[in-house]
Amino acid sequence: MCEALQKYGVTPTRGSAFGATFSIALMVSCVPALAADQVNTGYFGGVAIMGYDPVAYFTEGRAMKGSEEFSYDWLGTPWHFASSKHRELFIAEPTKYAPQYGGYCTGEVAFNGATINIDPEAWAIIDGKLYLAYSKEFMAEFKARPSDLLAKAEANWPAVETQLEQDGFQ
């Protein structure tokens, strides 16, 4: 039984359609994701790049949490911004500000041709493009030799993106 079921003391029972449906739904949510959204929304956040403002990396030079008050849906996903000005900049040029590889970890795309979550504080802008990673330590390595890693990530991304589309995330 997965931790979420144990946490809530849920035990599947026979003969209960509601119990069976509830248990199945909860168990499915406990299975590690084999597929991921094309835009990284975190594990349960439902907001692009864990609610961080993609424009702030460029204009403020730092990671900033966005606000639901300043949100915009792009690629079927809500994006949060720290201000209405940042939201308007993003609306005008989303591909300029959106992170590469759907906001997933650049290293995971490069080394494993897969997606994992990120630490929004682990970031770099290289040649005018935003890259995110799972840790600040990895990002330090990435900044030391970006061309090697980007070549691998660029080679792997089309297959990763295709897999995401095949899994029904567009």
Q: Where are the regions that the model predicts?
A:
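Bacterial N-terminal signal peptides
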Residues: S16-C30
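Basic side chains
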Residues: R14-G15, R87
